[in-house]
């Protein structure tokens, strides 16, 4: 079994997250959701909606939190009842009822061809599993005796690597794919290209095309992959997945084939203007689109020393800071998020897709504003008590190709080591020893 709890010390904010994303139930494929949208209260499964209360943080202190509010998953009682999103008890230490570990695993391949790994999530106080009330994997979430049933397995969903990010410009009209209205919800049509997030999309290995404004998927009205196209919550269904075969490309302009119907993304009429739907692939320019984006260099990740003590514990105030010569606009924030998700270099090697996805989510979350916190090294990642050593804060650097401007981001992500040599393990991985020279995936 893999432990979710490398350390038991309290974190006001989660400064060493192990994973961030949609936590889905293996049986129903629905998302773990905090009822309402404030991040507090009853926990149940729900259709995935892309909102922050469904962005779950698996924290290195053993707690499970959500991005909408810094609350902990807490069984109502002594670890034997319904689970709530409640204030974390931090002092004198986190109680075992708010700490969790991972149990048995089940690997499977989803509809997009991406391998997922679902695990049991076990409460330390009761030794019972996170469990969905309904045997179909829908309903309220509590804890129950571990029975190795599908509704007791959960996974942070991966879409695979991000392949493209930007606006989609039509070859015929030079107009861009646009979500009608200003909220990034509803019908999709062609419109003059502009720097609004409802025109920016991410394209993933599993075939999903996700709108940057609302985190929803390009979706065909008919479940058979035929009909009008809009954006809708991402359901892990083939009518929301698209391929981009080279046979349907003309230079940088390519057609998108719906995986359910094998029909092409098509603009109504023959001028490349108007509403968007699917139609038989005809090889005409109104069915071809080009990715238009601003380039950033591949980001690099390093650990910077923030304090050492060879005779005791290290305490430092940790802030989230961004250094950039220009304003970090909403457009720049999304570009950087996409750049991070496409790949990060640490110690001259590329980090895993899981690490880049989690870093991208951490970057996006940091844009809403954070407060400085005082953090103390009480334990090493290996769960041994911290007796001496150094604290390290993560730094991410990338350069905008067009302007040459450097952006440096120092998030509230830290590691504590015995050595005064920088940790050898990437963020969102675990140090297997006190000097952090050996690493394990979480």
Swiss-Prot record:
Residue positions, PTM Pyrrolidone carboxylic acid:
11
- List GO molecular-function terms, semicolon-separated: calcium ion binding; fucose binding; galactose binding; lactose binding; magnesium ion binding; melibiose binding; N-acetylgalactosamine binding; polypeptide N-acetylgalactosaminyltransferase activity
What is the activity's pH dependence per the UniProt entry? Optimum pH for hemolytic activity is 10. Hemolytic activity increases with increasing pH from pH 7 to pH 10, but almost no hemolytic activity is observed below pH 6.5. Binds to lactose between pH 4-10. Pore formation in artificial liposomes containing human erythrocyte membrane lipids lactosyl ceramide (LacCer) or globotetraosylceramide (Gb4Cer) increases with increasing pH. Cytotoxic effect on Madin-Darby canine kidney (MDCK) cell line increases with increasing pH with maximal cytotoxicity at pH 10 at 4 degrees Celsius, but no significant pH effect is observed at 37 degrees Celsius.
* Effect recorded for residue 350 to A: No effect on lactose binding
What outcome is documented for mutating residue 54 to A in this protein? Loss of N-acetylgalactosamine binding
Residues holding D-galactose: 19, 33-36, 49, 117, 131-134, 144-147, 178-181, 191-194, 219-222, 232-235, 266-269, 279-282, 286
Residues that make up the propeptide are: 1-10
Q: Quote the CDD domains the UniProt record gives.
A: beta-trefoil_Ricin_CELIII-like_rpt2, PFM_CEL-III-like
Which UniProt keywords are given for this protein, alphabetically ordered?
Antibiotic, Antimicrobial, Calcium, Cytolysis, Disulfide bond, Hemolysis, Lectin, Magnesium, Metal-binding, Pyrrolidone carboxylic acid, Repeat, Secreted
Binding-site list for Ca(2+) 4: 219-220, 222, 239
Q: What is the effect of changing residue 354 to A?
A: Decreased antibacterial activity toward Gram-positive bacteria S.aureus IFO 12732. Markedly increased hemolytic activity compared to the wild-type protein. No effect on lactose binding
Q: Temperature and function: what does the record say? A: Optimum temperature for hemolytic activity is 10 degrees Celsius. Hemolytic activity decreases markedly with increasing temperature. Binds to lactose between 5-40 degrees Celsius, with maximal binding around 10 degrees Celsius. Pore formation in artificial liposomes containing human erythrocyte membrane lipids lactosyl ceramide (LacCer) or globotetraosylceramide (Gb4Cer) increases with increasing temperature. Cytotoxic effect on African green monkey kidney (Vero) and Madin-Darby canine kidney (MDCK) cell lines increases with decreasing temperature.
Q: How is the cofactor bound here?
A: Binds 5 calcium ions per subunit. Binds 2 magnesium ions per subunit. Magnesium is probably occupied in place of calcium as excess magnesium is used in the experiments.
Q: In which tissues is it expressed?
A: Expressed in body fluid (at protein level).
Q: What are its GO biological-process terms?
A: antibacterial humoral response; cell killing; defense response to Gram-negative bacterium; defense response to Gram-positive bacterium; disruption of plasma membrane integrity in another organism; hemolysis in another organism; positive regulation of erythrocyte aggregation; protein homooligomerization
Q: What does its activity-regulation comment describe?
A: Ca(2+) is required for hemolytic activity and the activity increases with increasing calcium concentration. Hemolytic activity is inhibited by N-acetylgalactosamine (GalNAc), lactose, lactulose, galactosamine, dextran with molecular masses greater than 4 kDa, to a lesser extent by inulin and only slightly by sucrose and melezitose, but not by glucose or mannose. The activity is abolished in the presence of 10 mM EDTA. Lactose-binding increases with increasing calcium concentration, but calcium has no effect on hemagglutinating activity.
The residues that the entry says bind Ca(2+) 5 are: 266-267, 269, 286
What this protein needs as a cofactor is:
Ca(2+); Mg(2+)
Q: Name the cystine pairs.
A: 14-59, 31-48, 72-88, 129-146, 176-193, 217-234, 249-254, 264-281, 308-390, 377-416, 425-439, 431-436
Compartments where found: Secreted
> What SMART domains does the database record attribute to this sequence?
RICIN (SM00458)
User: Could you give one GO CC term from the UniProt record?
Assistant: Golgi apparatus
What result follows from mutating residue 53 to A?
Loss of N-acetylgalactosamine binding
Q: What is known of its domains?
A: The N-terminal part (1-293) is a carbohydrate recognition domain (CRD) having three ricin B-type lectin domains with two carbohydrate-binding domains. The CRD domain comprises of residues 11-159 and 160-293 and each of them has a beta-trefoil fold. Total of five carbohydrate molecules are bound by the CRD domain. The CRD domain is sufficient for N-acetylgalactosamine (GalNAc)-binding. The CRD domain has weak hemagglutinating activity towards rabbit erythrocytes in the presence or absence of Ca(2+), but it is abolished in the presence of 10 mM EDTA or by lactose. The C-terminal part (291-442) is essential for oligomerization. Oligomerization of the C-terminal part is induced upon binding of lactose. This C-terminal part is able to cause hemagglutination of rabbit erythrocytes probably due to hydrophobic interaction of the oligomer with the membrane leading to formation of ion-permeable pores in the membrane. Hemagglutinating activity of it is not inhibited by lactose, it is enhanced by Ca(2+) and completeely abolished in the presence of 10 mM EDTA.
Name of the protein: Galactose/N-acetylgalactosamine-binding lectin CEL-III
Q: Which gene encodes it?
A: cel3
């Amino acid at each position: 079994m893999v432990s979710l709890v490398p350390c038991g010390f309290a974190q006001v904010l989660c400064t060493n997250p192990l994973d961030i994303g949609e936590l889905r139930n293996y049986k129903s494929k629905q998302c773990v959701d905090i009822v309402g949208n404030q991040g507090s209260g009853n926990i149940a499964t729900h259709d995935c909606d892309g909102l922050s209360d469904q962005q779950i943080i698996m924290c290195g202190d053993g707690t499970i939190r959500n991005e909408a509010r810094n609350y902990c998953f807490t069984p109502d009682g002594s670890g034997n009842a319904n689970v709530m999103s409640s204030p974390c008890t931090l002092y004198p230490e986190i109680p075992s009822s708010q700490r969790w570990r991972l149990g048995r695993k089940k690997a499977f391949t989803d509809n997009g061809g991406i391998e997922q790994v679902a695990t049991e999530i076990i409460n330390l106080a009761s030794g019972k599993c996170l469990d969905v009330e309904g045997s179909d994997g829908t309903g309220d979430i509590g804890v129950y005796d571990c029975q190795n049933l599908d509704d007791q397995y959960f996974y942070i969903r991966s879409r695979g690597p991000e392949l493209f990010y930007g606006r989609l410009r039509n070859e015929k009209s030079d107009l861009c794919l646009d979500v009608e209205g200003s909220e990034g919800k509803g019908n999709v049509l062609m419109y003059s290209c502009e720097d609004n997030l409802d025109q920016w999309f991410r394209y993933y290995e599993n075939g999903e095309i996700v709108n940057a404004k609302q985190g929803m998927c390009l979706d065909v009205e008919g479940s058979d992959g035929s009909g009008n196209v809009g954006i809708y919550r991402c359901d892990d269904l083939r009518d929301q997945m698209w391929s981009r075969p080279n046979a349907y490309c003309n230079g940088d302009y390519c057609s998108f084939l719906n995986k359910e119907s094998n029909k092409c993304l098509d603009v109504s009429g023959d001028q490349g203007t108007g509403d968007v739907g699917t139609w038989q692939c005809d090889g005409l320019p109104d069915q071809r689109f080009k990715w238009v984006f601003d380039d950033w260099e591949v980001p690099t990740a390093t650990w910077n020393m923030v304090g050492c003590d060879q005779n005791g514990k290290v305490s430092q105030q940790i802030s989230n800071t961004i250094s950039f010569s220009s304003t970090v606009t909403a457009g720049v924030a999304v570009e950087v998020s996409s750049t991070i998700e496409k790949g990060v270099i640490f110690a001259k090697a590329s980090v895993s897709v899981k690490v880049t996805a989690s870093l991208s989510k951490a970057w996006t979350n940091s844009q809403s504003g954070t407060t400085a916190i005082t953090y103390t090294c009480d334990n090493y990642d290996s769960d041994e008590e911290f007796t001496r050593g150094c604290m390290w804060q993560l730094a991410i650097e990338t350069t905008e190709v067009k302007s040459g401007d450097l952006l440096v981001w120092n998030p509230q992500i830290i590691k504590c080591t015995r050595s005064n040599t920088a940790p050898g393990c990437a963020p969102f991985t675990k140090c297997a020893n006190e000097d952090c020279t050996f690493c394990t995936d979480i």
